Swiss-Prot record:
Binds 1 [4Fe-4S] cluster per subunit. GO terms for molecular function: 4 iron, 4 sulfur cluster binding; 4-hydroxy-3-methylbut-2-enyl diphosphate reductase activity; metal ion binding. This is 4-hydroxy-3-methylbut-2-enyl diphosphate reductase. Pfam families: LYTB. It catalyses: isopentenyl diphosphate + 2 oxidized [2Fe-2S]-[ferredoxin] + H2O = (2E)-4-hydroxy-3-methylbut-2-enyl diphosphate + 2 reduced [2Fe-2S]-[ferredoxin] + 2 H(+); dimethylallyl diphosphate + 2 oxidized [2Fe-2S]-[ferredoxin] + H2O = (2E)-4-hydroxy-3-methylbut-2-enyl diphosphate + 2 reduced [2Fe-2S]-[ferredoxin] + 2 H(+). The active site is at residue 122. (2E)-4-hydroxy-3-methylbut-2-enyl diphosphate binds at residues 36, 70, 120, 158, 214, 216, 258. It comes from Campylobacter lari (strain RM2100 / D67 / ATCC BAA-1060).
Length: 278
């Protein structure tokens, strides 16, 4: 069986930057997981004593705090600054961008439509910078019954599909007098999605590696599933089942933006081991 890696996969710029920062800082706490990958979070805790807290209120004896790649809310940032603690900001610059846009557009009197999951930490952070009114939606249908203002700015969660973003933008262009559109979907997301789209079309089994709480990884899985019915989302090599590859000729492999190379390598080794048996 042939195994092919997607042309673009794995660690993005923002995640690489955050991991490097955490390894250099050491002996620190992050507010929420630094990235959405349990394997890497465990490695940082064991090797660098970087632990994960659920909330700022859990900070006690820690001397250093790292802000997660997804960012935190404006209000939580203010709370953190009031603590007697050294702060290191690992927010991805691609996430900081929509935060700044929302803050500026609000000052100019625009209400803001955010394409994203309202429960995702990145979206919570971005929304907190809107001082007018924010509408968080996953579909243009959610805007049908809303009385929209004459001025709207539109941003997206960085890991969403560009096609869906455009559907929302097109709807608003027909309904609102003035629409300011900011494409805040990051380049790595676009490249990874494009690559898995291409690979899934020519594979008869797909394995996507990444955190099951990772938005970008789940998006890759959905794209793969659309073209390859036998697509599987796993966090590590232990979840792989050899039956997946029975009678298959080509296995495509991709990974989310928070998935480290060492995890991907273990997955590839396990697939090779199982396909030798077949």
């Amino acid at each position: 069986m042939e195994i092919e890696l997607a042309k673009s996969y794995g660690f993005c710029f923002g995640v690489k930057r955050a991991i490097k920062k955490a390894e250099q800082i050491k002996d620190a706490a992050t507010i929420g997981p630094l990235i959405h990958n349990n394997e890497e979070i465990t490695r940082l805790w064991k090797n660098y004593n970087v632990k994960t807290l659920n909330d700022i209120s859990e900070l006690s004896t820690e001397q250093k705090a790292i802000i997660r790649t997804h960012g935190i809310t404006k209000q939580d940032l203010e709370k953190l600054k009031q603590k007697d603690i050294e702060i290191f900001d690992a927010t991805c610059p691609f996430v900081t961008k929509p935060q700044k846009i929302c803050e500026q557009m609000s000052k100019e009197g625009y209400e803001v439509v955010i394409f994203g999951d309202e429960n995702h930490p990145e979206v919570k952070g971005v929304r907190s910078y809107v001082s007018t009114k924010a509408y968080v939606v996953l579909d243009e249908k959610e805007l049908f019954d809303i009385k929209l203002p004459s001025k709207i700015a539109v941003v997206s969660q960085t890991t969403k599909k560009i096609e869906k973003f455009m559907e929302i933008v097109n709807f608003l262009m027909l309904k609102v007098k003035e629409v300011r559109v900011f494409n805040t979907i990051c380049d790595a997301t676009f490249k990874n999605q494009e690559a898995i789209n291409e690979l899934a079309k020519k594979s008869d089994v797909m394995v996507i590696v990444g955190g099951k709480n990772s938005a970008n990884t789940k998006q890759l899985f959905l794209i793969a599933k659309n073209y390859c019915e036998d697509s599987y989302l796993i966090e590590n090599e232990k979840e792989i089942q050899k039956e997946w590859f029975s009678g298959k000729e080509k296995c495509g492999v991709s990974a989310g933006a928070s998935t480290p190379d060492w995890v991907i390598d273990l997955v590839l080794e396990k697939i090779k081991e199982y396909t030798k048996i077949n």
